[in-house]
Each structure stands twice: as structure tokens, then as C-alpha cells.
Amino acid sequence: MRYFIYCLTYGGRLMKAFKIILKILLALVATLILVAAIYVAYVFISYYRIEDNLSLEVENRAEEDSAVLNKEYTIVSQNLGFGAYTADFTFFMDGGKESRARSKESVIDCIEAGAEKVGSFSPDFILFQEVDLDSTRSHHVDQYLMLQELFPEYSHTSAVNYDSPYLFYPFNSPHGASNSSIATFSNINMTSSLRRSLPITDSVTKLLDLDRCYSVTRIPVENGKELLLYNVHTSAYGSDDSVRTAQLTMLFEDMQSEYEKGNYIVCGGDFNHDFTGDSSLTLNGSETEYGWAQPFPDDLVPEGFTKCENYKDGEILPSCRNCDIPYEEGNYTIIVDGFFVSDNVECVVVENIQTGFEYSDHNPVVMTFKLK
């Protein structure tokens, strides 16, 4: 009898403890569901696309008023990688580990190193991509402001490429919110600049996808026409062929329309394609290893335009590395950055400068050209 009473008492305590634990677990699950619901609502509420055909502010006045014919000009395209990519940096979206630059000081060092390298070519025009304005991943360093201070003699403009909501992943170090731009610098005065919104996916993934754009900057030419500089950064992550095709189709139709008016077109940037179509094979001895690095669809390039592949000394050198592992010679590299010109522009020579990827996952691409 005493044993029976003991069992009832002990069993009752166990049942009570079990109920308490169950309530705690249910409360935790409910809290997680509530947090997830709030986050989803935040993402939906925060989502917006920057308007198309957005006029951009042109700042500062350069010394030259117009471009001239038959003069050699130098233009550099440089993806700065938001100041995070030292040679040993790996990025979680590429299969690596890190989601943010390691420190504010590292960001400043990388941007300064990139600007110094670009400036060493004494360029007439500069096209920068992945220039963060106020992003968690780059410790809120205003990189466009830094570039203005580093290139004080240039006229310049900036277009927000994407302004994405806070990404709570990876959970141990969230990537955070990203406000990033493309920036164009010129030592000849700009008359205007325009931001064009590129097509992106229509699926629900667009909520956390990156908005995309290109900018069109107008520079007077001595004969009354205009030189149009297209600064481009097309989609990579999470984009299918239809989105990439739609983006390039829009870009090329715009360029062709301006060329038909007699204007001069120079388009450069990060195209997130194997630019030559076979650089992956040439540089690595194998076909494309990564889904984002598809051959550039040359069939989309309109009549009257040339993809600039006349590399200095015929050398095929990389402009980009994959960031799944720290960089060392022999790692996977590819060409994704480059230039297109209209037929009234002569591409004299192009060179993919080798930096050892010390300050970015992209090398600068330098082109010399003439207006004919």
C-alpha cells in the first residue's frame, strides 16, 4: 500500500514536470513562429523596386568640357567587392564561410588599395561596381564618399544598384542590410546620368534577391554628338537564364537605340558571365565549375557592336575568382568583366590587370579607345 501511494505521488510529480516542459517547448515554438512571421512581414513590407528612368545627380566639375575625336582615352572597370575581399576572404554565397568584411579598417584598406591601383592608370573614365553606401556587410563605410575624396578632380555620379532588407543569415553572423551602388567617374564633364532598372525574377525569391541596374552617363563630344558610358552589374546569384537574357536584351536594345542616333557607346562592368565564352576552360583546363559562370550569349550582341577581346599581347588573364576558398595561384578563375563598344568607337587594346586579388575578388580591366 505504501509503495502504491509512493508510485502515485512520484508519477504525479513526473506528469507535472512533463506538462511544464511541454508548455516551455510549446512557448519556444510559438515564439519562433512569431519571430519568423514578423520577419516575413518585415521583408514583404520593406520590399520595393527602385523606379526606372531615375535621373542621377552629377557632382563636381571636371577640367575638360567635351571629348574629341581620334584621341586615345583610357577607361577602367573595377568591381570593388564592397571592400571585403582580401585574398583570403571567402563568401558564404559562393560556398565559403564569411558574410561580412572582417573589420571597418579592412574595408577602408581594400577601397584605398583598389582606388590606388585604378588611379595608377591615369584613367579618363572609371566604372566602379559594388560600392557600398551604408551596408552591414561593410561596417557602414560610405565607399562612394571615399572615392570622391580619392578622385577629387573627376566629375562623378552614383546609382543605387540594390537596397535590400536585413538578411538574418548566416545565423551566427547575419549578412544584414545592403545598400550598394555603381559609380561612374569622368575627367570630362558629364551633362546627365540616368539609372535604368534591369528585369529580375518574378518569383517570391525576389523579396531577398538583389535589385539590379545599369547607369547611362552622357558626355559631350566636339562634333555635337554624345559619348554614352554604360556602367553595368548584372545578376549572378539565384538568376535563371531567362532573367539574364532579359537583362542583356534590355541593355543592348538601349545601346542600339542610342547608337542609331549617331552617339558613341562604351559599355563596361561586371557581366557575371564567362565574358569570352571559353575563359573558364582556357584558364582552368576544364569547363565551367559554377552555375553562375555561363558563357556570354554572343547571339544577343546587336549589329554595330563589338565585344572587346583584343587583349594585350594576346594574353587571356582572369578578372575574377570564385570565393569558396582563400585565393592562391591555381584556384578557379574566370573573366566576367569587360567592355563593349559601338562601331564608331575603336577599341585599341584591353588588359586584365593582375593584382593577386589582394583587395577585391575582381581585377581591374583597362581599355584604351578612340572615338572615330
Pin down the residues of each PLM region.
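Surface-exposed cleft-lining segments at the edges of enzyme active sites
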Residues: K97-S103, V131-L133, L198-K206, H233-S242
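Short proline/glycine-enriched turn/loop segments at secondary-structure junctions
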Residues: T205-K206, I325-G330, Q354-E358
